[in-house]
Every structure is written in structure tokens, then in C-alpha cells.
Regions:
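Catalytic, metal-anchored helix/loop core of enzyme active sites in primary metabolism
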Residues: 1-305
Length: 305
């Protein structure tokens, strides 16, 4: 999740949002600039080596600054915090997710590793209204469940674009470059998630995330390649009905949904024009070529933390 996307909303939505605290690994200059722009009074940095960064001297005296993983997690306990958007990368985000829910705050979760690594620990603390997924696919599934009885869902259809290497053979994949892997056809993401998306590893992690979020088995989740990236995911019900969430591929939409729920705010994202779509394709993933997805499915079936 791009922090700049998130911070569009306090300016765009009058009196709805206030930035109370910000945390990052080591992006000191950026955090100081945002703290000054939004009047944020609490900062934390996971990397303790930035303690002496010159930019910190620009902060007002009433701004508290902490360093280390404990300082980042402590932000979730602040009295004036209502919702925590956790977009930390990797398993480092698990503690913030756990502490947020333990403190009774709303967790807007963009850190899938929290559930992949520790879903059995996190989910008992969550309710339907306190854990809101920010990943576009899981936000879509969440919205497809609204107004339904969960036990009447038959399966989840989890979509993916197929990445830049869709249709390639193993031999062809042995020749690809890092630059090609970083050229995702649909989403603008950080390098780690972009590479994981190219190998379909990220989609495998999303299956495990969905298992925990929606309390379903691995084999009740079908991954389907959808190159147009218009259908963000679907839920099929026992009566044969299928609810799908469609829209443009813009992360601002699921971010805003998590921040505004149970309401919907007007979005800066473009609106979808169905007349410009010649077709919507849905294909089986190549599990023999993209072994990362296969391994993730096996891990999901095995369970555990």
C-alpha cells in the first residue's frame, strides 16, 4: 500500500479522518514531512539506527518519536487511535495486527503476512467489524459476503491477473530478468510484492489469508486467472448465485472502503466503463509451471502457524 494514497483521505474527507500517528521502517524525511503536514503528534521507526537522523530536529517539541519494533506496536495503544492501517511489509507486521485487535481498535489490514504466519492467533481477536481487509481481492470478497449468511457460501473465486509471465513455459521462465518481473501489467506495488506476484507466490499467500479471514478451507478457494483485472474476486453461494466485485484496478478503492466502512465516500478513482471492455476472461492457473502457488496451497492445507 502506497502511503501517499492513504494520506490523500484526511484532506479529501472533511472532519472524517485525523492522522494521529505514523510508523515506518526508516523513511525519516518522508515521515517528518507528513507529520508536519497533518499535525501528527506520534512517530515511530522500526529501524533504531535512524535515531540520529537530522530531519528529526525539524519536528515540534510536542511530537513524540520512538524507535524499534516495540515503539511501532505501542502506537496501537494510544487513547486517541480508533483505526490502525497496517501496511508493514512481511511478518514484522504481525505484532501490530495482534496489538491493534487486542486493544479493541479497528484493524485495516494490508499486511497479509499477519494472517499467513499467525492467523490462528490473530483471528480469535477479530470480529466482522474490527478486521477490514485492504488487499483488493479480500476487500472484494468481504463486500461479496455483506448481507449474506457465511454458511451459505459454497466457494470463493480468487482472481489474479496472471502477472507479466502468464502463458510462459518453465524453459521460458528460466530466461526472464528481474526487470521483467518488476513490470506488473496491472498494479503498482513495491518490488517484493511485484516479484511475488510474477511467480504467483503472492496469490498463494492470499489464499492462506482468505482461509483465515473467511474461515474456509483451502479447497473451497479457487484461484482463477483474469487478465483484465476488472473482477476483483467472487463468492459463489449454494443456490448457484455468484456475487462479484468489479471496478477499476486502483488501490485507493479498497483503502477507502476500509477507512470509511460502513459508509462509502466519493472516490478520486476513475469509474469503470463497461462499454470499453471487449471481454472478461477466466482461466485456470498453470500449477505445473508456477510451483510457488502449488506450494502455498499445500501449506494452506497443512495449516498451523
Amino acid at each position: 500500500v502506497d502511503l501517499q494514497m492513504v494520506l490523500e483521505y484526511p484532506d479529501a474527507v472533511d472532519d472524517e479522518l485525523e492522522v494521529v500517528a505514523l510508523a515506518a521502517g526508516r523513511r525519516v524525511d518522508e515521515m517528518v514531512r507528513y507529520a508536519q503536514e497533518f499535525g501528527c503528534k506520534h512517530l515511530a521507526f522500526g529501524d533504531e539506527t535512524v535515531r540520529d537522523a537530522p530531519a528529526l530536529a525539524q519536528l515540534d517539541d510536542d511530537v513524540s518519536v520512538g524507535f524499534g519494533a516495540a515503539a511501532v506496536a505501542a502506537l496501537t495503544q494510544l487513547d486517541d487511535v480508533d483505526i490502525v492501517l497496517n501496511a508493514l511489509s512481511g511478518e514484522a507486521g504481525m505484532r501490530a495486527s495482534y496489538d491493534t485487535l487486542k486493544a479493541g481498535r479497528i484493524l485495516a489490514l494490508a499486511n497479509k503476512e499477519s494472517l499467513v504466519v499467525g492467523g490462528d492467533l490473530i483471528m480469535p481477536l477479530a470480529t466482522h467489524d474490527t478486521l477490514l481487509p485492504v488487499d483488493s481481492e479480500h476487500s472484494a470478497i468481504y463486500q461479496c459476503y455483506l448481507g449474506e449468511f457465511a454458511n451459505e457460501a459454497l466457494r470463493i473465486w480468487l482472481t489474479c491477473s496472471g502477472g507479466p509471465f502468464r502463458g510462459m513455459t518453465r524453459d521460458e521462465l528460466s530466461q526472464v530478468t528481474a526487470a521483467q518481473a518488476l513490470a506488473h501489467p496491472t498494479w503498482n506495488m513495491g518490488p517484493k510484492i511485484t516479484v511475488d506476484s510474477a511467480t504467483l507466490m503472492n496469490k498463494g499467500l492470499e489464499v492462506i489469508e482468505a482461509q483465515h479471514l473467511f474461515d474456509v478451507k483451502t479447497d473451497d478457494i479457487r484461484v482463477v486467472v483474469h487478465p483484465q483485472s476488472c473482477v476483483h474476486s467472487m463468492v459463489e453461494y449454494v443456490d448457484g448465485s455468484v456475487k462479484a466485485h468489479l471496478g477499476v484496478a486502483d488501490m485507493r478503492i479498497p483503502i477507502q472502503f476500509a477507512l470509511s466502512y460502513p459508509h462509502r465516500w466519493e472516490s478520486p478513482a476513475a469509474q469503470v466503463d463497461f462499454t470499453q471492455m471487449a471481454s472478461l476472461e477466466f482461466l485456470d492457473p498453470d500449477l505445473d509451471t508456477f510451483r510457488c502457488l502449488t506450494l502455498a496451497l499445500e501449506a494452506g492445507r497443512a495449516g498451523g502457524t
